[in-house]
UniProtKB/Swiss-Prot annotation:
Name of the molecule in the record: Calpain small subunit 2
Function: Calcium-regulated non-lysosomal thiol-protease which catalyzes limited proteolysis of substrates involved in cytoskeletal remodeling and signal transduction. This small subunit may act as a tissue-specific chaperone of the large subunit, possibly by helping it fold into its correct conformation for activity.
UniProt binding sites for Ca(2+) 2: D131, D133, T135, K137, E142
CDD domains for this protein: EFh_PEF_CPNS1_2
GO molecular function: calcium ion binding; calcium-dependent cysteine-type endopeptidase activity
Length: 247
């Protein structure tokens, strides 16, 4: 067994060390397409009109049987579920290719973000850190959780991209990370910049989202393992490899 020590607010160096090896994702463009344009159009409407809001990491989504949750759903969520059902197919899950098509369809409607889109490799990375049941795909609750986060983070990106360059510079990025709900120490912040920013220190939208998806997943994983809430976790080598290798 070995001990991974971290404080969730990011002030302790242990969090920087623990998360540093887990940071991955990012990538360049690959166009979405296929025969799902009509279905995607319906889903895109739910993200295109997102209101500005700050993000606070939430508990991981719980998988529930459709009949349990449908009775208490709002009309918007019910319509969203119907669109998801058409897109997901009989297994009721979406994979990395479907996710790439959806995200790039959304980005095509937001020219101000000035990004070429998400690559398939980036979407595989996003799926892996969001895939709580390790099926290699996202179920409805996982997908909805991701979707809601992207809506909020899109608003944060727009708010801090004050020069409309499509990229967050060093001074903008610090504020954007805090507005997204992540209080990071300087060591971890610099590691993130080195991993996700370009040579000039700027971070575009798809790398910003990739970074926050992974940060959110790592915070949630730590909280789940820190059962007595003392800021310490103890994991076996097998648990550590399962946590780090798949994500």
């Amino acid at each position: 067994m070995f001990l991974a020590k971290a404080i969730l607010e990011g002030a302790d160096r242990g969090l920087g060390g623990a998360l540093g090896g887990l940071l991955g994702g990012g990538g360049q463009a690959r166009a979405g397409g296929g025969n799902i344009g009509g279905i995607l159009g319906g889903i895109v409407n739910f993200i295109s009109e997102a209101a500005a809001a700050q993000y606070t990491p939430e508990p991981p989504p719980q998988q529930q049987h459709f009949t349990v949750v449908e009775a208490s759903e709002s009309e918007e969520v019910r319509r969203f579920r119907q669109q998801f059902t058409q897109l997901a197919g009989p297994d009721m899950e979406v994979g990395a290719t479907d996710l790439m098509n959806i995200l790039n369809k959304v980005l095509s409607k937001h020219k101000e973000l000035k990004t070429e889109g998400f690559s398939l490799d980036t979407c595989r990375s996003i799926v892996s850190v969001m895939d709580s049941d390790t099926t290699g795909k996202l179920g409805f609750e996982e997908f909805k959780y991701l979707w809601n986060n992207i809506k909020k983070w899109q608003c944060v990106f727009k708010q801090y991209d004050s020069d409309h360059s499509g990229s967050l510079g060093s001074s903008q990025l610090h504020g954007a990370m805090q507005a997204a709900g992540f209080q990071l120490n300087e060591q971890l912040y610099l590691m993130i910049v080195r991993r996700y920013a370009d040579e000039d220190g700027g971070m575009d939208f798809n790398n910003f989202i990739s970074c926050l998806v992974r940060l959110d997943a790592m915070f949630r994983a730590f909280k789940a393992l820190d059962r007595d809430r003392d800021g310490l976790i103890q994991v076996s080598i097998r648990e550590w490899l399962q946590l780090t290798m798949y994500s």
